[in-house]
């Protein structure tokens, strides 16, 4: 698990501001991880199963280049809202791949809040603007809702870099 800044602060802030702005389209999902979990979120899919599904995908070009993505499996943004406690979603992996296929997951934090990404090992990575956590795509992890900001916005990247 590695944590790093992703790029030029101004470049990244412009893109994050677009996602945080009122013109960006978000879609309601009644379940965050599994059907019936009751932990809703809003989502915007950019790439699904390697196919572009959003006209906004070009805002991600600097991330794709910086993270040296050779093949993108999926990219989506998640938006959750302030809760009364730091609720953890169910541990999961983002995408299912062949047993021997190596891929990475990166979670980019668009805003700073007391939410986090939690790993099965117990490691916790706080949501800090302009930072990403990168890890083996088969690592169990979960999102933790925030209590100190109106919203928590992240971009999830699943990709192959070899």
Model-found features: residue ranges?
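Single conserved hydrophobic/aromatic residue that forms the stacking wall/gate
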Residues: 1-12
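A short, well-structured alpha-helix characteristic of acyl/acetyltransferase catalytic modules
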Residues: 13-29
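Signature of the catalytic double-stranded beta-helix
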Residues: 18-23, 34-91
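Residue-level detector of short, conserved catalytic/binding motifs and their immediate flanks
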Residues: 75, 104, 131, 153
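A short beta-strand-loop-beta hairpin characteristic of the jelly-roll/cupin
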Residues: 86-91, 101-103, 109-128
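Short beta-strand His + acidic residue motifs that chelate non-heme Fe in jelly-roll/DSBH
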Residues: 90-91, 140-148
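A short hydrophobic beta-strand segment most commonly corresponding to one strand
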Residues: 106-108, 149-162
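Conserved metal-binding segment of the jelly-roll/cupin
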Residues: 122-142
């Amino acid at each position: 698990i590695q944590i790093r800044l992703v790029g030029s602060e101004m470049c990244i802030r412009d893109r994050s501001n677009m996602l945080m702005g009122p013109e960006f389209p978000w879609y309601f999902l009644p379940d965050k991880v599994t059907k019936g979990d009751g932990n809703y979120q809003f989502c915007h899919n950019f790439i699904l199963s390697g196919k572009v599904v959003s006209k906004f995908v070009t805002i991600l070009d600097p991330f794709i280049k910086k993270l040296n993505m050779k093949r993108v499996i999926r990219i989506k943004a998640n938006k959750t809202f302030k809760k009364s406690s730091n609720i953890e979603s169910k541990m999961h992996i983002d995408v299912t791949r062949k047993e021997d296929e190596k891929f990475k997951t990166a979670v980019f934090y668009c805003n700073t809040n007391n939410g986090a990404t939690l790993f099965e090992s117990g490691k916790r990575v706080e949501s800090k603007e302009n930072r990403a956590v990168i890890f083996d795509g088969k690592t169990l992890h979960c999102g933790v809702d925030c209590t100190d900001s109106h919203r928590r916005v992240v971009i999830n990247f699943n990709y192959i870099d070899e």
